[in-house]
Amino acid sequence: NSEGLAEGIETRELPPYEDNPNIGDKGWRKLSLFNEKLADLEGTALFLDLDIVIRSDLTPFFEAEGEFLIVKDWDFPDDIIGNSSVFRFEVGKHPDVLENFYKLGNEIRHDYKNEQAFLSYEMDRKGILKYWSSDWCVSFKRNCLQPFPLNFFLMPKDPENAKIIVFHGRPTPEQAYKGFMGKGGLRYVKPTKWLDKYYQ
């Protein structure tokens, strides 16, 4: 749905995707980006989730060496799983990723927590899994929030060297800007007013 987008943003139809209601909504539709054809696009593509905040120029994300790069997931430091909020891939080069997803069918939910786990293991199997520099893409929850109880008194930190701030789960960027109280009251987020610098 392209309604409400700012003038000048070009859109394309989403690629075909065979929905499987038995595996739940874990972002699996992202895998449709690995169709052999992706609208009229070709070459290198950078995927960005909508619930991120861009702090600086994205050019380095296109200059980094590697065929497939993704954020190293903060929740799985001892696993190869990436966070698919920000990843780069070559359009049309990996249709087998989508094909393997379809082949697994309902079994996929037993072997993989979500789409980013499956994607990471597929790219590792192909020998091309690489991660962005850890200071490029940071987690708002892990890297910006003040530790308890300082979070009740101090605004979250603006990560000086980060290029992208990833908001996975709660709070969303909008919730963080206004202030947010998580379940149990411990994960309180003071209104994060410096976010407006990146929403010009």
Named regions from a protein language model:
Residues P95-Q200:
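Catalytic core and acceptor-binding pocket of nucleotide-sugar-dependent glycosyltransferases
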Residues A45:
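Short aromatic/hydrophobic "clamp" motif used to bind/position activated sugar donors
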Residues I52-N83:
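Conserved donor-nucleotide/metal-binding helix-loop-beta segment in metal-dependent transferases, i.e.
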Residues S85-G92:
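Short glycine- and hydrophobic/aromatic-rich loop-to-beta-strand nucleating segment
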Residues L48:
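Catalytic metal- and UDP-sugar-binding loop of GT-A-like glycosyltransferases, i.e.
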Residues N1-A6, I54-T59, D135-W136, R170-P171:
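Short, polar loop motifs at secondary-structure junctions
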